[in-house]
């Protein structure tokens, strides 16, 4: 089977705070969920969460990168959802649709940089 991803993924756990971006003009109550990444790439992340997000939903992400302990922010779109344990836990694929250039550089360094010098 041909790999459809554009970017290689790195398997690692990073803390994620995700906030659902409401659709339409009417304000909606803020929905914030906490999660961990299962993998991460320049194009997106895969998370495990108890939040039943819909395909196509947009979320704000704050990701704390485990190796560097730096945080990045991005907006992502839900691309796929898989039930893991009935309707209690979900595996969700998120594609970054907005990420600032400074956050993008932090992510590049995190994924491809040599990391912190050892002392």
Where are these regions (language model features)?
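Short conserved beta-strand and strand-loop elements enriched in small hydrophobics
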Residues: 16-20, 58-69
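Short beta-strand-centered aromatic/proline hotspots
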Residues: 35, 73-82
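Short solvent-exposed strand/turn elements
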Residues: 89-107
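Short, conserved beta-turn/loop elements at beta-strand boundaries and strand-helix junctions
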Residues: 21, 42, 81-86
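Hydrophobic core residues within well-ordered beta-strands of beta-rich domains
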Residues: 12, 33, 59, 72-74, ...
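Short glycine/serine/proline-enriched coil/turn segments at secondary-structure junctions
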Residues: 26-27, 54-55, 68-70, 84-86
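Short strand-loop-strand
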Residues: 24-55, 60-62, 93
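N-terminal helix initiation/capping motif
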Residues: 1-40, 112-119
């Amino acid at each position: 089977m041909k790999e459809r991803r554009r970017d290689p993924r790195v398997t690692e756990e990073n803390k994620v705070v995700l906030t659902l971006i409401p659709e339409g003009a009417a304000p909606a109550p803020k929905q914030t969920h906490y999660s961990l990444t299962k993998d991460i790439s320049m194009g997106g992340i895969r998370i495990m969460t108890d939040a039943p997000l819909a395909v196509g939903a947009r979320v704000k992400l704050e990701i704390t990168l485990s190796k560097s302990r730096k945080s990045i922010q991005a907006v992502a779109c839900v691309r796929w959802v898989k039930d893991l344990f009935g309707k209690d836990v979900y595996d969700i694929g998120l594609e970054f649709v907005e990420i600032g250039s400074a956050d993008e550089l932090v992510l590049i360094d995190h994924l491809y940089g040599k990391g912190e010098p050892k002392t």
